[in-house]
């Protein structure tokens, strides 16, 4: 599973990097975190978390600095979080998280992306109850038992620790993600491949042929929207 999360980050970076969409999305997220608290990551845990994730996605330093500088200025642009749930082909389910300065625009765009690409937008809660929110931490290593003990000693609420092909994946309660990251740092972990809050599907579906092609187009349409920050789904090996 650890390789899965690392591959997702790598794939998104490769796909979005050419158009700088990923930079723009992190720029908004950094701006919001800095605006809501101190613009100093050493004094603002939420900001530090977003910056760390941006670095994992290879966002350049000048993009990060520009977003923080914007938050320090007189700009008073307001962004609102949103969530849109829906369905794709053959039992696939999708959750779309947004961060936008224009809710009406975003809702219309997401609905259009669903409708024009083989999906259907559902009501709030129609999909999310079949997902579990968890913290996900991925880093190089192979001793899952030792990591599990370290986290328990630090009083971190750990759901699971997996080791696969030189990569360790830690699943925490969502409220303990930051605590888990700090505990691992205290125990010598210097670099993380993934540190994210994720919506984990309780079960997955396998898509093939036309269904898989339709699903890929749907996900691409959703992720290409500037206001969409994260897209979660229940399709295996995608």
From Swiss-Prot:
* One Gene Ontology cellular component annotation held by this UniProt entry: cytosol
Q: Where are the transmembrane segments?
A: none
Q: Does the keyword Cytoplasm apply?
A: yes
Q: Which SUPFAM superfamilies match?
A: YebC-like
Say if the entry is tagged with keyword Cytoplasm: yes
Q: Please classify the protein's predominant subcellular localization into one broad category.
A: cytoplasm
> Where found, per UniProt?
Cytoplasm
Q: Which GO terms describe its molecular function?
A: DNA binding
Source taxon at top rank: Bacteria
Q: Name one Pfam family in it.
A: TACO1_YebC_N
Q: Provide the alphabetized UniProt keywords.
A: Cytoplasm, DNA-binding, Transcription, Transcription regulation
Any one GO biological process: regulation of DNA-templated transcription
Q: Which family does it belong to?
A: Belongs to the TACO1 family. YeeN subfamily.
- Entry protein name: Probable transcriptional regulatory protein MGAS10750_Spy0264
Q: List the source organism.
A: Streptococcus pyogenes serotype M4 (strain MGAS10750)
